[in-house]
Amino acid sequence: MEKYINVIGGGLAGAEAAYQIAKRNIKVKLYEMKPTKFSPAHSNENLAEIVCSNSFKSNLHTNACGVLKEELRILDSLLIRIADETAVPAGQALAVDREKFSKRVTEELEKNSFIEIINKEIDEELLQKMIDNNETVIIATGPLTSDKLAKKISKITGNEKLYFYDAAAPIVSKESIDFNIAFYGNRYEQEKKKDESIEEWKKRIENQEKSYINLPMNKDEYEKFYNELVNAEVVELHNFEKREIFEGCMPIEIMAKRGKDTLRYGPLKPVGFDDPRYAKRP
């Protein structure tokens, strides 16, 4: 009887699992319900689709995120290798072109002779059949698990599913940004040094890697922005969503409602920047 491992879910975890198993000359059946069926969060047909932020966080070896990525490079992680190949400027972080990234992962897995990609939704009956046949199964469907499969997992584990309300990452067109006000700069690298003249500082920041675009605000502008944000129309919940917030991935409008200064001491803190128009912190 031919030996193989079933991997259910062709997202980030499932794609990496399939690659690592195949690398060890073990056959894989990789099940992905797209393009037959899409979850409300999915939009393209490729494997390893990035549905939230395109940032894999820091590349620096001075923090845990960077060290973990370097270890994954040493261990020949498919995802990190392709992330490096499809990287876009992001300062000291590793961010990717989400379309190129998922397309390249799909190409790598499709050409692997040890991997069979099956575009089919796994439901309760199919999973039970795998279990009855004593097949090895890796379930890597993550937070976008279909309802049919989620019910079966709940029965097997005896636990209700976990849940949190995720925030979508907005995409802003560069053409819509006024660069008479906005400026490029990485936090702490863009800031004027005490021993620099204005001319030396401006020359240095002009030659910096253009990774992040910053939009400075004065007090009146910030207060107007804050009021617009907390009173803005919000996306209506889908019938499968509940507004249960995870602190590590919080929608900005919910964070703002905790207080007017919350953003100023959080993601919008001006520390590490100087506005090139005035050579001082916004």
For every predicted segment, state its role:
Residues 2-13:
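Beta1/beta-strand and adjacent pyrophosphate-binding region of the FAD-binding site
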Residues 4, 27, 161:
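Residues at the starts of beta-strands that form the adenosine-phosphate
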Residues 10, 33, 167:
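Cofactor-binding loop segments of dinucleotide-utilizing enzymes, especially the Rossmann-like FAD-
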Residues 19-81:
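N-terminal FAD cofactor-binding segment of flavoenzymes
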Residues 60-64, 88-104, 141-148, 213-220:
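Short beta-strand to alpha-helix junction loop
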